């Protein structure tokens, strides 16, 4: 993406009009364009606190990983969404690390953590925008927690499949039992048994 395309992209955000010319140029000078193929780990235990990810195209999965290797999906991001938890080390209220994988081929822009931190300190509008986006995603996290604690496995699978159909706009889904299990925080064998009922 060339500089003019980046400029057009960022002008759509409400914080842009409140940035100084110096900060705008600083943002554009530090933005990096990235591409990840489906299945790639974008942020993991080895690679934490990348910065803020602006998803141009694709689907990202944001999840927690236990010491035992169990995964719990927090939420998914789709075209034109922003991943703020990829910069969790710069957000003082966030005290946990997340994993981020590309579920499909993804094109995104990265504002690395250090430039992101400087811009957040300089601009209350950007800071407010980032915290607002973060809190919006927490409604998805709470919904996931509610499902885990208050729904049966069969209900969780059904809710997940309905959400996926709504998100993709299709009644046909191509998912493995392993992918369903990872997404709902269960074991593949348990999902398999439940689907056979």
Model-derived features: where do they sit?
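Cyclic nucleotide-binding regulatory module and flanking cytosolic helices
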Residues: 1-37, 82, 87-91
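His/acidic/aromatic-lined binding-pocket segments of jelly-roll/cupin-type domains
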Residues: 33-34, 43, 50-56, 73-75, ...
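Short phosphate-coordinating micro-motif centered on Lys-Gly-acidic
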Residues: 42-47, 89
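Short, Lys/Arg-enriched, Trp-marked, Pro/Gly-tolerant hinge/linker segments that flank
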Residues: 141-153, 169
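Phosphate-/nucleic-acid-contacting segments
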Residues: 153, 162-197
């Amino acid at each position: 993406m060339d500089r003019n395309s980046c400029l057009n992209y960022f002008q759509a955000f409400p914080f842009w009009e409140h940035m100084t010319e110096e900060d705008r140029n600083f943002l554009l000078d530090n933005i990096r364009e990235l591409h990840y193929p489906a299945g790639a780990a974008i942020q993991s235990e080895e690679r934490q606190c990348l910065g803020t990810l602006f998803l141009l195209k694709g689907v990202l999965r944001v999840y927690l990983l236990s010491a035992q290797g169990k995964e719990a999906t927090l939420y998914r991001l789709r075209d034109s969404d922003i991943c703020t938890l990829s910069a969790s080390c710069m957000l003082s209220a966030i005290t946990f690390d997340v994993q981020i994988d590309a579920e499909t081929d993804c094109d995104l822009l990265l504002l690395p953590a250090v430039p992101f931190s400087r811009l957040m300190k300089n601009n209350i509008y950007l800071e407010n925008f980032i915290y607002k986006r973060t809190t919006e995603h927490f409604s998805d996290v709470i919904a996931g927690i509610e499902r885990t604690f208050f729904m049966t496995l069969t209900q969780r699978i059904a809710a997940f499949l309905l959400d996926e159909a709504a998100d993709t706009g299709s009644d046909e889904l191509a998912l493995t039992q392993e992918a369903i299990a990872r997404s709902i925080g269960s074991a593949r064998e348990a999902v398999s048994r439940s689907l056979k009922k």
